[in-house]
Structure formats: structure tokens, C-alpha cells
Amino acid sequence: MLRRAMLRFARDRKANVAIIFALMLVPIVFLLGMTLDYTLALRKQEQLNAAADAAAIAAVRPAMLTQSDDSVVQATAAAVFAAKANLPGLSSTPTPTINVVDSGLARTITVSYVAQSVNNFPSVLGRQTWQVSGSATARASSAPNMNFYLLMDDSPSMGIGATTTDISNLIKYTASKYQSAASSQNCGFACHETNIAHDGGTQDNLAIARARNITLRIDLVTSAVNQLLNSWSNCPQSGVSGGVMQCMAALNNTTYRAALYTFDVGLNTLATLTTPTTAGIQVSNISLMPVYYQNCVFSGCSSSSTTNPTTDFGTDIAGALSSINNIMPAPGLGSNASGDTPQEVVFLVTDGVEDKISATCPNASFASHSRCQQPLDTTMCTTIKNRGIKIAVLYTEYLQLIASATTGIQTTDSWYMSWIDTYDEPTSSTGTIAQKLQACASPGFYASVQTGGDISGALTNLFIKVASSTASLVQ
């Protein structure tokens, strides 16, 4: 009889859907519960990963990179993580594991965590929580403490007009109508001669330029250095006074010092290594090198003298670099670690042509009285860089002194054509002069600006490039 009842039940199709649903209900509830709890756990993991990212980045911000105590760095990262990781649906706020690795100026932070997401269906899954974990790594190099040695060319060639209009006006107002010294007439350079009367003049070309409000290249260099040390209106951080250097020091939370020099036949000290603000006081003292008169640099010149002959000269770039090299100490990493010292950086601003009395002239042939006019001999640059010192070069391009309506030069300069033009071809941007200066600079730290260009902007951009550092999230 039981057997018959079972057979009737098997053949009966009434209520089959309800029975099948009842049989499937248990696994469906299990799957729905597991899916809901798993989805909530993944959401918690994403939020905790974001907290770990924020904590890792916070620990490599510029302000933290100056902190040498790992416990302070870890506490900062932990506080940021805790503020963002206090989420509902966790059994407790997780305590992160924070690993700090410093290598020189580089710091790597790893923030990892393990948390328990509370399950809504603990009986279905057979456990109260679902474990989630994750980590974030951030790496940054702190902006190093740096000493900057600003080396500005003040030789007579830096007295050229700043723009083509200035050059044209200089040539115009040094004509015989305005300049009685024949050797200084029709000249695009505002040479500063202390004994212009020797040549029959009453005022030198520099005095004429000042009287006519003609801007010179050295004026633009002075303005650029002033922006670097004294006044910059574009600092993105409020409350910072001073120039670009002070602004970048504040942004990078680091220390910069500056020394200010000019050079011609030798090195001229305007400010030894000090704060940028103190060095900035001396910017107004940047001025053109004076000469006694044409073809006589110093009083007492003589054709028989080996050091003060009767010829024009006045630019010893390699000599200035050698003198700076003797002043600069061995560079450090620039960290705040005990015993470490700042990095050392030379900023060279020049038109790139040496004009000096020398026993050797490796890049050119001698003119009269052992006068060597040549592109920079980079031997000293190599010596400095081999010490681990960086060199940044701003090339104020040597204008091609060839008659041209474009440049405003009315007459081709025969001296230029004889001694300089071959190094200034095919253009001032690509000739041997430019190539030598680029070879002198450390990789990536070279810039050039043509006559009439923005020297202030070029020097500012070059400095920011040297001083910049970044932090990045690795994973």
C-alpha cells in the first residue's frame, strides 16, 4: 500500500513548482546572503584602500620628508588612516602596519591593514565576519637643502642692447653727432670706459645708454636675479615674501642659501653664501666691468706687458669657474640627517665667449698679445661635475653682429666676423658656443634665451627645474 501511495505521488503533477521552489530555497538564501556580505566586504575594502592611500601620501609630503624620526612619520600616517578607516560595518577600526624605508633623500612608505567586515548572515556563512586586507605604497624624494652660487657675466659684451630696438638706438646715439670718441662710435655695446677722454670723448657709451633710457642685456640679467632673490609676484603659496628662491624653499619645506658673484677678467664677490634675502641686497651692485679705454683694459697697459697688454679682453669664464670650485665645499645629499650637508649648485649666466689673455687657446687661435677669444673650454666644468656639484647654465645667446634689417644692426662688425662668427654659426642657438655651454651644464639644466627674450622667465624656470621634486603613489 505504501508502494502504491509513492507511485501516485510521483505521477501527480499538481504543486510541482511549489515543491521545487521549496527544495531550492535553502541554496538560494545561502547564495543571496553570501553575495550581499561579499559585496559589502568589497565596499569596505575599497574604502580602506583609499584610507591607506591617503596615509601613505601624507607620510611623504614635503613637510614630512624633513622628519627623520620614523615614529613621528608612522604616527602621522596612522592618524590619517584612522580618521578615514572608522567605518560602520567593521568589527573594529583596523590598526595599520606602517613601514618606513629611507634611502638617502628617498623615502618609501607602505601602509597595510587587515580588517573584519561584519556579516549580515553569519549563520548562513557559518562565520561572523569576512576578512579584508590591502596595502598602499608611496615613494618620494625630498627636496634637498641646496647652496646656490650665482655666477653672472658682467664683461663688456653684456653691455649689448637688450632688444633689436635698443641695439639700433645705441648705434644711432653713438654716431659722431653724439659720441666724439672715434673708437666708440656706431657701436651696439655700451662699454664703460673710465678714461674716455683718452680717445677724445666726454662721455662713454654706457653714459649715453643711460641718458637715452636704452636697456642693456646686463639690465635684464640684473632684473632676473632680482626676481630670483627679491621679488616674485607669482608664488602659489600665500604669505611668502621674497623671490623665487624663498617661494620654492617654502613650497618644498627645505633650506636654500645663495652666494652672488660676477665675473670678467676675474671673480667679483658681491655676497658670500648666506640667506637668499641677504644676498638679494647686493643685486643692485651688479654692473658692467669698467675698462680704462679702448684697447687698454687697465691703467698702465703696455704692448710689452704679458698681463695688461694694449688689447681688449675681459671674459674668463673658465677662470671664474675655477675660483668658484675652490670656494665650494664637497656637496652632501642635502638631507636633514645629522652630519649631512647641502647639495652645491652653480648657476652660470653668460653669453658663452671667453676673451682673455692666456698661455693656451684650445678652442681657437690667438689674436694679438696672446688674446684668446673662444667658446668655453669645458675642462673646469667637468672637474666641478666630477665632484658631484650640479651646474645650471643660462645662455644669453651671443648675437650675430651681421647687418640685418631683422636684428637692427646696420653694419657688419669686422672684429666679430674675424674672431667669433665661426663659432656662432649656423645660428647662435646651435653653434659651437651653444654646444660648449650645453656640454658644461649638468643633464637637463641648460636653457638659452635670444636677444629680446625673457631672461627673467628663463632664469626662473631653470631654477624651478633644479629645485623641484615630486611624490608619487606607487601601488
Residue ranges with predicted function:
Residues A22-L36, A50:
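Alpha-helical hydrophobic helix detector
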